[in-house]
Regions:
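A short glycine-enriched loop-to-beta-strand structural element that forms part of the catalytic core
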Residues: 112-114, 140-155
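Signal-transducing coiled-coil linker helices
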Residues: 2-37, 44-59
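A short pre-motif secondary-structure segment
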Residues: 100-103, 143
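Conserved nucleotide-binding and Mg2+-coordinating catalytic segments in signaling enzymes
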Residues: 29-49, 63-77, 85
Length: 155
């Protein structure tokens, strides 16, 4: 759709400034559509629209925060939000720009790692799990995070 708008000449519908404003708004809406409001990572809709039927080789991992309900019940929902944010920041530090972290909902994330061989994939998942376990949740020094991770390579 954005490409179609860019193809319009200055005489059609609006001037070039108006067209640029429209393109900017559409980009902003697209960003909102595909981003999780709490964590800022991609959301389930992004996965369903952009990734699910992709035909590239990659590693795909599920990351699930262990005992998330307990964190919320013990420390409050703010602490749960901070735990999710800590996981996102930790995973992002461990991954490449081409990798995609997607929040499927609640405490479940999907990590898509394009062009990843088995040895590096396994090492990367272990690194992520270890880094999350060592991570400090800001404002909650007694909270220790643990995640369950499982993955598969696609061909």
């Amino acid at each position: 759709m954005i490409e179609m708008i860019n193809r319009l000449d200055d005489e059609t519908l609006m001037d070039s400034e108006g067209r640029q404003n429209l393109v900017s708004k559409l980009n902003s809406y697209s960003e909102e559509l595909y981003r999780d409001a709490l964590t800022g990572v991609f959301n389930r809709r992004y996965f369903e629209d952009q990734i699910r039927d992709a035909s590239f080789c990659c590693g795909v991992a599920m990351i699930d925060l262990d005992d998330f309900k307990l964190y919320n019940d013990t420390y409050g929902h703010n602490a749960g939000d901070m735990a999710l944010d800590t996981i996102v920041k930790t995973v992002n530090r461990c991954t490449r720009r081409t990798d995609r972290l997607i929040r499927l909902g609640g405490d479940e994330f999907l990590l898509v790692l394009p062009e990843m061989d088995e040895e590096n994939f396994v090492q990367k998942l272990k690194q992520i799990q270890s880094q999350i376990h060592e991570a400090q949740v800001p404002g909650y020094s007694k909270m220790r995070l643990s995640v369950s991770v499982g993955g598969v390579l696609t061909r």
